[in-house]
């Protein structure tokens, strides 16, 4: 399958920027709809990237955007919602379930067979959190279209890299406060680098062997949340005291943070952590999957202004 033009939904976000760059580097024309074009200046100057101001909330708008495209990539997702509703809130339903429904229908109307979709490791209709339940239902909708469309789903663990809201958030707090209250420190993750995720998407685009597959995207090592916070503290040279919270106190803290205009954490995030975001030998990995170690990348953007970070960055660039 020869892919020359791609519609990238959610392309102005963290992972989308990496994928857009990879596509652009390969000479593929990329269309990234956005509501506020002025906020995406770094992408606008990329060659082969077009960013029309379009609201994608209607099937008709999606069909129009898909005209002349060879493939669609959907990365749209949210981490927080202001409502608590079973099985999930209106916000989660719209982003993770209703939008994939519209995308599938629009692909069929526009005659675009190739669809790649972002789910999440642990996504399932039976998962403990609204986020994972809605992601699971959205994934099922996309996978059910296989046959009429050529679909591939990706299910990453937590994604790290320059511009993330994961290690960078830890680093910001550790630099500012003398203590770090940490709940669910036992939760396990298998962090994967955003550039590796981008490569998985781009390498799969024209590969018929990936049609109908749901791939798990994980890094080479499993960490507890406490280990990741400790490592980030080491990178930034923080002496902050890390205080382990009981489950009750963790949910109280998350509830208070959830009330802020831009929450860093919510009770639903903690419920997601009840399921380890790891692959314990039951993975469906992409062919030739060789993920990059977190320790090779994190110092290049977390500790770049510390002596240790500068040395680690030099070693990484030098291939040492």
Language-model regions: role of each:
Residues 127-129, 154-169, 223:
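Flexible, glycine-rich beta-alpha linker
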